[in-house]
Regions:
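ABC ATP-binding cassette signature C-motif
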Residues: 1-169
Length: 169
């Protein structure tokens, strides 16, 4: 459960949130709407632990996974399919542990990492990411192209696919 009590959040001299109080139960779906600059992105950054409070209390369970769509348009040479798979940070952490175990030639750590990789859905990640991209209007023949090669609208859809790839509560 997420609890905000009398939260005050500022960006510069202007208050974005003042005396905000809300409880969000596990499994509850919440939409965040408001005008530009009213603090929607800042509130999400607060919930992800990326911003500090200016006042009040914010309780977010440590194990909670929150997915959100980045507003910034990615402009990199990384393939769009990899950008989407990056949304599953647990899977990427598992891949990193596997690579480290291979570099150390640690067979036990490799076996543990491979077991975790399977549990994380690593063997199906690429096909799941491709299905998300296909469903959002991408030409599946182009999913290995750099994300920078796509229009702004398609790059925003890639951000949506990345958020959908993230296992979240």
């Amino acid at each position: 459960m997420i609890h905000l009590r009398n939260v005050r959040l500022r960006r510069g001299p202007e208050p974005l949130l003042e005396a905000a109080t809300v409880s969000i139960l596990r499994g509850e779906k919440v939409g965040l709407v408001g005008r530009n600059g009213c603090g929607k992105s800042s509130l999400l950054a607060l919930l992800r632990g990326e911003l500090a409070l200016d006042g009040g209390e914010c309780e977010v369970p440590a194990h909670l996974s929150i997915a959100s769509v980045a507003q910034e348009l990615p402009h990199s040479q990384r393939p769009v399919i990899e950008h989407v798979i990056d949304g599953d940070q647990g899977l990427r952490d598992c891949e990193r542990r596997l690579q480290e175990a291979e570099q150390r030639n640690d067979g036990v750590a490799q076996a543990e990492a491979l077991a975790q990789y399977e549990l994380q859905g690593g063997y199906t990640a690429r096909s799941r990411a491709a299905a998300l991209l296909d469903g959002l209007g991408f030409d599946v023949q182009r999913i290995d192209e750099p994300i920078a090669a796509f229009s702004g609208g398609l790059r925003m859809r890639a951000n949506l696919a990345r958020a959908l790839m993230c296992p979240s509560d």
